[in-house]
Amino acid sequence: MKEVNKEQIEQAVRQILEAIGEDPDREGLLDTPKRVAKMYAEVFSGLNEDPKEHFKTVFGEDHEELVLVKDIAFHSMCEHHLVPFYGKAHIAYIPRGGKVTGLSKLARAVEAVSKRPQLQERITSTIAESIVETLDPHGVMVVVEAEHMCMTMRGVRKPGAKTVTSAVRGIFKDDAAARSEVLEHIKRAD
C-alpha cells in the first residue's frame, strides 16, 4: 500500500494557508504544515489496513448466541469535506461453527475502517461484510451513530444532529425478534 506523503501534505497546507490570506511563516503557523501532515498520517492510517485481517484469529467456542459490543467510540474524516465525524459503533453477531473472534478485534476493525476518508454508510457496511466474509456467522448487525462536523460547522449548521446507519445480514435481516433484541440492548443505558 502507498504511504502518506507528509512532505506533499506540508506543501499543500502551506499553499492553503497562503490561499486564505494567512502568513505561513508567522509564529503560530510556522509548524502547522508539519503538524497537519503528522495528524493526517495518523487519522488516515486505516488506508493501509484490511479490517478482515483482524478476524483471522478465532476461538473454537461452542457459543451460537448473541455477541454484542456496543459504544465503540470512533472518529473519521468525511470524504466530501475532509472534516471529522465521530460517534459510536455497535456490532452484534451470532457465531456459527465455533468461530468466535476476540472482542477487541471488533473494535480494531472499526478503527481500520474509520481511519480513512470515509462515508458513514460505507463504514457500517464494510464492517458487516468483513465479519460475514471471515467468520460466516448466523447473522451480523452493525449500527453506527455519528455527528458530522460538515453539518455542524458549515452548510445547514445543525450541531447535535446525529446520523444513524445500519447494516443487517443473515438472521437479523430475516428475524424481527432477533433484530429487536439487539436494538433493545443498544438502547439500554449502562
From Swiss-Prot:
CDD domains: GTP_cyclohydro1
Binding residues for Zn(2+): 78, 81, 150
GO biological process, one term: tetrahydrobiopterin biosynthetic process
Pathway connected to this protein: Cofactor biosynthesis; 7,8-dihydroneopterin triphosphate biosynthesis; 7,8-dihydroneopterin triphosphate from GTP: step 1/1
Entry EC number(s): 3.5.4.16
Keywords: GTP-binding, Hydrolase, Metal-binding, Nucleotide-binding, One-carbon metabolism, Zinc
GO cellular component labels: cytoplasm
Pfam family, one: GTP_cyclohydroI
Chemical reaction(s) catalysed: GTP + H2O = 7,8-dihydroneopterin 3'-triphosphate + formate + H(+)
This protein's record includes keyword Transmembrane helix: no
GO molecular function term, any single one: zinc ion binding
Family: Belongs to the GTP cyclohydrolase I family.
Subunit structure: Toroid-shaped homodecamer, composed of two pentamers of five dimers.
Matching PANTHER family: GTP CYCLOHYDROLASE 1 (PTHR11109:SF7), GTP CYCLOHYDROLASE I (PTHR11109)
Protein name: GTP cyclohydrolase 1
Provenance organism: Bacillus velezensis (strain DSM 23117 / BGSC 10A6 / LMG 26770 / FZB42) (Bacillus amyloliquefaciens subsp. plantarum)
Biological classification of the source: Bacteria, Bacillati, Bacillota, Bacilli, Bacillales
Gene: folE
